[in-house]
Amino acid sequence: MVTKEQRRQKIKARVRGKISGTQERPRLTVFRSNKQIYAQLIDDIAGRTLASASSLKLEMTGSKKEIAAKVGDEIAKAATEAGISTVVFDRNGYLFHGRIKELADAARKGGLKF
């Protein structure tokens, strides 16, 4: 029987074969744990993280969805400071629902295009 984590890893590998981030259009990847949420802008060609934001770093309070939205705002601010306006969104095998969707919507409102 395939567990949820094995299913996610399979989807993640399939999607990562198709998308890649560059300096001009980095990959916005999201990692979700039970308590925290993390977002990174990655240049896959150089293998560098250009910007990052997380609920752990910001020490926020509120519901998990509210925190995800704040992390989305923070990654959008970090991207604009780095001169990035368009990204490739990598949901990392998670469903585009709940906290992932809140983070993506907040990043879009913050000025990122994907």
Swiss-Prot record:
Coiled coil feature spans: none
Gene Ontology biological process terms in this record: translation
Record keywords, A-Z: Ribonucleoprotein, Ribosomal protein, RNA-binding, rRNA-binding
GO cellular component entries: cytosolic large ribosomal subunit
Statement: the UniProt record of this protein carries the keyword Repeat: no
One matching Pfam family: Ribosomal_L18p
Gene3D superfamilies the record matches: 3.30.420.100
A single MF term (Gene Ontology): structural constituent of ribosome
InterPro entries: Ribosomal_uL18_bac-type, Ribosomal_uL18_bac/euk
Subunit-level organization: Part of the 50S ribosomal subunit; part of the 5S rRNA/L5/L18/L25 subcomplex. Contacts the 5S and 23S rRNAs.
Record's function text: This is one of the proteins that bind and probably mediate the attachment of the 5S RNA into the large ribosomal subunit, where it forms part of the central protuberance.
Similarity comment: family membership: Belongs to the universal ribosomal protein uL18 family.
Record-given protein name: Large ribosomal subunit protein uL18
